[in-house]
């Protein structure tokens, strides 16, 4: 019996679902090549990697569940800490920005800033107290901070960890998706993904749904296992000209392989790029001690 072990550690879930449901988006797979000509693409040698690349990421944490009292009624909320930052790689890697913010996310109209011994939680309104709505409000605030920090630095290529949605306005931004839960390609075009070699990409395709974006798949080096091992999906704004997004896809394919992580150093190798992994660790460190903040909140509520 022959078998292979996935380098992506099991405690992070599966990088690729065993059965990928079809997307509800409309896909135009003939942006760069017609369907019959689909095959793996190696970036041309005349498409060198950009000398300056900015990597951005954000992290968040719920510090406590909160109930805001209003007479006999109570309204739910969350006290949360979130952070965003950017790493500039221009021959060396440097954290060029990192900010931490906190908030009381709630729909309670009578909510006030919560003052603790070490920190405070200003009120950040949410449309309702539904847990999913509160979580989305937190995610949106983190995304807004990430956009602000990314736009403050001049780099021809900005790698955004996660989907591009909401961050299309950042010049040079490319969404970087490490895991796969939906199938955007079918038939012979999907089979091209399995045929990718290290550093190769698929042709660019266009996805149209509630928002439109260009996309392509790329295989990073150091991947073993199933046909999707080491495969990431990239997204670019649909506002790009076709020729520009093809050049961008080539630049990304030329740039990212050297940043791919190794299994003995990162449990999410090779998809968890070194600059993003390092930035995530730094941002989580800056969130502060969760147990201390929880105690502070309990004291403030007493």
List the predicted regions and their residue ranges.
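Short hydrophobic beta-strand that contains or immediately precedes a catalytic carboxylate
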Residues: 54-56
